[in-house]
Amino acid sequence: MITSTFGDGRGHGGIDIADTMGAPIVAVADGEVISAGPAQGYGLWVRIRHDDGTVATYGHNNTNLVTAGQRVEAGQKIATVGDRGNSTGPHLHFEVEDRSGAKTDPAQWLADRGTPIIAAD
């Protein structure tokens, strides 16, 4: 469930998806891990350059299960949900950058690929 939307009046560069501590985080598409480790504000993150050229960031992870340079497939477990960094509770912070590096709405990006998710009311 989306608990914080893209932009949301405070320049939020992604969406927050609430889940339980330790729940699996999976890659949304095939690609190469370009960074996996600590990152200011995110606690632990994984960044993947997907085969379409977009870069996805998966943040506030409790544990990372992949390393930079590793090839991943859609659906592969890459991390677990956590609340590290600037976080108010267990969730996945998910960002998408297009090929030019501009942040784009991850919920719309997922919906365009047949994976719609819902926002909390």
Question: PLM features: what roles do these ranges have?
Answer:
Residues M1-D121:
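Catalytic cores of peptidoglycan-degrading enzymes
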